Amino acid sequence: MMNYSCAKAVTDERRRTGNKIVLFATLFMLVATNAVYSQGKTPVSWKKVKVLVYTKNGKGYVHANIPSAVKAIQEMGRQKGFSVDVSDTPTVFTQASLSKYNALIFTSTNNDVFDTDEQKVAFMRYIQAGGGFMGIHSITGTERKWEWFKRLVGGTFVRHAKHQKFKQVIVDKQHPATIDLPAQWEVDDECYYMNTINPDLKVVLAHDLRSVNDPEKPMWFGDSYPSAWYHEWDGGKQFVTVLGHDGKMYDDPIFRKHLLGGLQWVLAGNKKLDYSKARAVSPTDPLPY
């Protein structure tokens, strides 16, 4: 039988060992968390940044918000010191042209926005070379039949609730796209839903479905549904927000902070494009996973 002093020694050692394990686990989680956010919080040398805003729409509905979105991004560029080019012409999608940009911003693009497979491949190779990408509002309704693109943006639009005021839930309070948002944020917008979702998305913001008037709202995620997310896929960094239907939103300082934070995450930590890593030869190349 173990005497009291021996038992106490064993208990103390187990406690010390347990504390060490807890401490190690805590430190590991902190390091992992910091690793996730370090790129997003890395200061961006804005004056060295050049972005392309792409606004092409295929046959079908075209959002009236596009001029407002372009104006907002241009004004943010002037405030921060980064350059902004704008195009609705798919011929801009060549390696020579895209290699000038640190990030591409697709704002309220919809349906088919490329004319040729060569343009699609140039876009794929840009992403694979490490190019940044940000999609705004109806981006999930863009290129709905192209599997690679659907995985890039994170999902495929299926429908939205009627335009109304409803609340947003901040899922990740430390991300640059949400860190400056109010704890209670009500938007006057459309609640977008998708019928496919890439499983690797890191959601930062969600629709509060309890505040949405929609008898057909899906309850796959309980009372919330993703509205903004980020991931790193096929060599590049992507940020998407489905908010921004009404052109007036782009004058809202809060929404601008949301957009600028998303762009900051895309740009932070980015290295120069490395086309030696680009491998695409066809839009139907096998997906990374």
Put a short name on every predicted segment:
Residues 34-38:
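Sec/Tat signal peptide C-region and signal peptidase I cleavage site
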Residues 1-18:
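N-terminal secretory signal peptides that target proteins for export/translocation
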Residues 57-60, 90-93, 109-113, 133, ...:
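Solvent-exposed loop/turn segments at secondary-structure junctions
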Residues 22-33:
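Bacterial N-terminal signal peptides
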Residues 40-49, 72-82, 88, 212-213, ...:
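Extracellular ligand-binding/catalytic regions of CAZymes and related secreted enzymes
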Residues 51-55, 98-143:
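Short alpha-beta junction capping motif
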